[in-house]
Curated annotation (Swiss-Prot):
Catalytic activity: (4aS,6R)-4a-hydroxy-L-erythro-5,6,7,8-tetrahydrobiopterin = (6R)-L-erythro-6,7-dihydrobiopterin + H2O
First-listed, main subcellular location of the protein, grouped into a coarse class: cytoplasm
Source organism: Rattus norvegicus (Rat)
Protein name: Pterin-4-alpha-carbinolamine dehydratase
Database matches in HAMAP family: Pterin_4_alpha
Family: Belongs to the pterin-4-alpha-carbinolamine dehydratase family.
Binding site for substrate: 61-63, 78-81
Subcellular location: Cytoplasm; Nucleus
Length: 104
């Protein structure tokens, strides 16, 4: 990805986070990151979702922290480069939402 990531300012957070909060993303307590848990009909759909997200994450060179058990996928996003939330996390979370909606 071009350019160094910067940690979102309070003003940027106020502008960028409400749409994600509205669909269930939460800020983690004690860490500058966002988190959401997704539920799918079965393991195949959960794995298909993860595959689509993984392909986009690789293109963006920005990878989620995630955990999968059967039909549940837990995702945490934070940018290591700036030790906190960046626009990269917001963009990836928005893409993840689009994929999740298309898989339900």
């Amino acid at each position: 990805m071009a350019g160094k990531a910067h940690r979102l300012s309070a003003e940027e957070r106020d502008q960028l986070l409400p749409n994600l909060r509205a669909v269930g993303w939460n800020e983690l307590e004690g860490r500058d990151a966002i988190f959401k848990q997704f539920h799918f009909k079965d393991f195949n759909r959960a794995f298909g979702f993860m595959t689509r997200v993984a392909l986009q994450a690789e293109k963006l060179d920005h990878h989620p922290e995630w955990f999968n058990v059967y039909n549940k996928v837990h995702i945490t996003l934070s940018t290591h480069e700036c030790a906190g939330l960046s626009e990269r996390d917001i963009n990836l979370a928005s893409f993840i939402e689009q994929v999740a909606v298309s898989m339900t």
